[in-house]
Amino acid sequence: MIFRLTARSGTGLAAIMMILATGAACADTFDVIEATPLKEVWLNPGFYSYHFQRDKGLNDSNPGIGGEYRFSTVASATVGRFYNSDRAYSSYAGVYYQPFAIGPVRIGAVVGGFNGYPKMRNGGWFPAAIPTLSYEYQRVGLNLAIVPTYKDRLYGALAFQLKFKVFE
């Protein structure tokens, strides 16, 4: 599956680059995280999406319910359901793999499946690999997914997901 970022996503890309540059400037080093076992449960209330194509009338508010089971310092399983950008309900299941860090920000991707997008496989399930950044502090965290545009079927966005640790 080939993704492309459109010219209109330049503002979003500039914002991402500024975030990464700021993190790199503040951090002592770029680190490879050592994988050690964990048992943490996080819950989230969905997403807020800042779409690159602002003229499409897409839904930026994506409420829902999701969970993340962090079984390692570098990996976690995730599942959830939310009201998507196309104003339809979507479900997802996947695995975050984030083996790198710049300061307190973990870097990697979430790989899994999504459904509910009418223009993508008629709303059926499809695979996706999405770059992600994560920051966690005690019982609160934030996942930032950098969702690329895919043809005229999926619209690119910066997807912000607030999460809360409920068990460790």
State each model region's role.
Residues 47-50, 155-168:
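Outer-membrane beta-barrel "beta-signal"
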Residues 1-37:
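Cleavable N-terminal export/targeting peptides
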Residues 106-116, 123-126, 130-147:
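Outer membrane beta-barrel
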Residues 45, 65-69, 79, 93-98, ...:
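Residues on the lipid-exposed face of transmembrane beta-strands in outer-membrane beta-barrel proteins
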